[in-house]
Structures are given as structure tokens and as C-alpha cells.
């Protein structure tokens, strides 16, 4: 992976590199490969992730169809 450093601006180059790595999923993969994961645990994790994705997709679909209220967007500067 390459990032150009312009005008000796290393901070900006590091920020761009981190963004690229985040998009590629490298940090997540490093976290997962940090220790051995048994095949049964891997299957269980992948199944749980698939269920989570399906549930999220169904929720978004219901919101688009108007069956669920849209989540209100937080106002800037307020908690």
C-alpha cells in the first residue's frame, strides 16, 4: 500500500494511510489474527456476523417502507 508524502507533510500521509487501511479492513484482520481462533469459534463468529447483517438490512428495509420510524439525527453540539 502506498501513500504519497507531499511537502514533507507526514501527518497528512499517515492519516491517509490509516484511512486506506481502515477501508481495506486490515486493522480488523490484525485484531482477528492476533490469537488463534478455533474453527468452531470462527464459524460461530461468522454466523453471528451474518445474523447481525441480516437484521440490520431488514431494519433498514422496514424504515424505507415506513413501517419503522427513522432514527432522529443528533443535532450538532448537543448530546
Curated annotation (Swiss-Prot):
InterPro entries: Ribosomal_bS21 (IPR001911), Ribosomal_bS21_CS (IPR018278), Ribosomal_bS21_sf (IPR038380). GO terms for biological process: translation. One of its GO terms (cellular component) is ribosome. It holds the Pfam family Ribosomal_S21. Gene3D superfamilies: Ribosomal protein S8 (1.20.5.1150). GO terms for molecular function: structural constituent of ribosome. It comes from the Bacteria. Keywords: Ribonucleoprotein, Ribosomal protein. Residues 58-79 are annotated as: Disordered. Belongs to the bacterial ribosomal protein bS21 family. HAMAP family: Ribosomal_bS21. This is Small ribosomal subunit protein bS21. It comes from Beijerinckia indica subsp. indica (strain ATCC 9039 / DSM 1715 / NCIMB 8712). The gene is rpsU.
Amino acid at each position: 500500500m502506498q501513500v504519497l508524502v507531499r511537502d514533507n507533510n507526514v501527518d497528512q500521509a499517515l492519516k491517509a494511510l490509516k484511512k486506506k487501511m481502515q477501508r481495506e479492513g486490515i486493522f480488523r484482520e490484525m485484531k482477528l489474527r492476533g490469537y488463534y481462533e478455533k474453527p468452531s469459534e470462527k464459524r460461530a463468529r461468522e454466523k453471528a456476523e451474518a445474523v447481525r447483517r441480516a437484521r440490520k438490512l431488514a431494519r433498514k428495509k422496514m424504515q424505507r417502507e415506513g413501517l419503522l420510524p427513522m432514527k432522529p439525527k443528533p443535532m450538532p453540539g448537543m448530546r
